[in-house]
Amino acid sequence: AELEAALAATVDDAPDCDWLDHSECLFPFPSSRFEADDPDTETGRRLAFPAGAMPVNLQGEAVDPEPFARSDGWGVGTPIMVTIAGVDPEASGFPSEADPATSVDDGSGTVIVDLTTGDRVAHWTEVDARPEIDEADRTTVLLHPLTMLEPGHRYAVGVGQPVDQAGEPIPVSDGFRVIRDRLETGIDAVEQRRERLDEVVAAVAAAGIERAEQWLAWDFTVMSEQN
């Protein structure tokens, strides 16, 4: 009940944001949280950003979400990003730029799965520690696929239990925990996404990170060539 109450408060405080990652509104990125079903597109999806989720420019004006709605998915080169507070990437088993081949081994701390084909996608990770926002709780991890993503395909991204610089496990978000641990909630925003996210968790488990070991998993659809 305590977990559900905390998650409900998170959803209520930022209804336009993704409750899977409490630190950044649009994270993890890119995500099906900001897609909608659309039977008239090639992918069956289109981008759908609530106005309240859009970043604000230097003039204090929110970016207009409307132009994005013309896309039936995300660009093939869209950066894949997630916030992992104070993570030690090496100790967490994240594949490095020097050795990206480990990203398709079962011991990899991150996985990208092409849900259209079932194939794992080789990639490397980069920790973005910019000094101007060098706060431990704002550590951004980027996943860089070695090849361009396939137009029209749906992808899953998974992160195994990461550890911080002291070797301590970094706590999982309330939002992902209720999905991973199959904890039913009375929160509509959560339950509406449960079925889709369950598919993602299962795909990540099949790709080598067991359900109980998952720290975060999400999905997104790449735009079609016809878009």
Question: Locations of the language-model features?
Answer:
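Acidic, low-complexity Ser/Thr/Gly/Pro-rich repeat segments typical of extracellular/periplasmic
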Residues: E2-N227
